[in-house]
């Protein structure tokens, strides 16, 4: 089956054609600041991004005869994981999303191309997948509720692949999935549902190459009201300029890990501290799963680092077997989900938020 995959990022658009799960063609480009400067809101980029995708297809002489089109899910209202058919409610919510990101355009572009192909259009496991158990939502401040934002697509895809590799279904296993990238999410996967996970985007859990993670609340409040920073600057500290970037002036984990492996400070101390916060979060998810954990999966780009994996395994491998599944194959994960929906192996969900 021919599956067309669309993945719009903040400064890039990636597309690929799969025959079943095999990639046969891929293209994309980085969009410069000049390219996007005329657009004041991400929604205004719709025609630009759609025309870019169609132009690449035309240049490669690829006809619009796909069996399915699937896009990276956008920042929708909280919804359970799975494969979703793109419907009018979804498109409305993406166009009116509270959070602005280019991934919100993926489903809109996929839907239009699918209409020309007379084929189904899907998204799968968007970042806002919310399967939290009730106790995981409450905080000590009634006005503040924990929310679920994490690397759902990759986390669930590697979970399914691991389950298949041992002859099981994802829904039969309890897993801790540690996604190690620019942001870090550590989730408790209980029989196919992520019942607890840190908010990997907005300042919770481990610190990461670009994000601050959990910060002592009193000191953060004092910083906010010190008069030194705007709200925008504080938010940038939490997401974008926090973590390794704040301490070391860089987010390049390859370079930092090399220096750390040679014992060079402050690189070793800061990187080891980050990994310590990751291990603590994995331990918390072990408690969430009541110690019944089939495996701990390490995934994402940082899982390619022997240094980081070695430090982490030394802190958590007594909890459960540690499985290494490095990298983040978003395009392959999306194709896998579309194929599963087409074959009826994965149930097709209806987007109908409460």
Which residues does each predicted region cover?
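Short glycine-rich, Thr/Ser-proximal phosphate-binding strand/loop in the N-terminal lobe
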Residues: 3-44
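Glycine-rich phosphate-binding loop plus the immediately following alpha-helix
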Residues: 105-111, 123, 138, 143-174, ...
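Conserved phosphate-binding/catalytic loops in two-lobed NTP-binding clefts
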Residues: 306, 310-336
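Phosphate/pyrophosphate-binding loops at sites that engage ATP/ADP/AMP, CoA/4′-phosphopantetheine
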Residues: 55-68, 165-169, 282-294
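Adenine-nucleotide phosphate-binding core of ATP-dependent small-molecule kinases
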Residues: 236-290
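Structural signal for terminal/edge beta-strands and the immediately following C-terminal loop/tail
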Residues: 326-354
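Short beta-strand-loop/turn "lid" adjacent to the catalytic site in phosphate-handling enzymes
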Residues: 57-103, 120, 128-140
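Glycine-rich phosphate-binding loops at beta-strand->alpha-helix junctions
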Residues: 293-312
């Amino acid at each position: 089956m021919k599956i067309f995959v669309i993945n719009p990022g903040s400064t890039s658009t990636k597309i690929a054609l799969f025959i079943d799960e095999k990639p046969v063609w891929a293209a994309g480009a980085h969009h410069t600041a000049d390219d996007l400067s005329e657009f004041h809101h991400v929604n205004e980029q719709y025609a630009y991004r759609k025309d870019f995708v169609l132009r690449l297809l035309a240049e490669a002489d690829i006809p619009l005869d796909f069996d399915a089109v699937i896009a990276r899910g956008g920042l929708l209202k909280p919804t359970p994981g799975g494969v979703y058919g793109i419907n009018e409610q979804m498109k409305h919510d993406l166009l009116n999303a509270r959070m602005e990101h280019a991934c919100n355009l993926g489903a809109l572009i996929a839907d239009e191309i699918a209409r020309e192909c007379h084929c189904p259009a899907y998204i799968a496991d968007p970042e806002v997948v919310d399967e939290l158990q009730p106790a995981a939502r409450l905080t000590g401040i009634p006005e503040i509720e924990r929310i679920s934002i994490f690397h759902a697509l990759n986390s669930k895809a590697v979970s399914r692949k691991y389950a298949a590799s041992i002859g099981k279904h994802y829904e039969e296993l309890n897993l801790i999935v540690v996604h190690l990238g620019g942001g870090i999410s550590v989730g408790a996967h209980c029989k196919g549902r992520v019942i607890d996970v840190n908010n990997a985007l907005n300042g919770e859990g481990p610190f990461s190459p670009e994000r601050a993670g959990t910060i002592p609340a009193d000191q953060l409040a004092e910083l906010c009201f010190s008069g030194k920073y705007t709200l925008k600057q504080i938010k940038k500290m939490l997401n974008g300029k926090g973590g390794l970037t704040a301490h070391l002036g860089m987010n390049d984990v390859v370079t930092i890990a090399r220096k750390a492996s040679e014992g060079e400070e402050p690189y070793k101390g800061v990187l080891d501290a980050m990994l310590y916060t990751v291990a603590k979060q994995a331990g918390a998810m072990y408690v969430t799963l009541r110690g019944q954990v089939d495996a701990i999966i390490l995934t994402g780009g940082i899982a390619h680092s022997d240094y980081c994996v070695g430090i982490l395994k030394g802190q958590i491998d007594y909890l459960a077997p540690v499985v290494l599944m490095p990298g983040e194959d978003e395009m392959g994960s999306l194709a896998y989900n579309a194929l599963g929906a087409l074959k009826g192996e994965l149930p097709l969900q209806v987007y109908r938020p409460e």
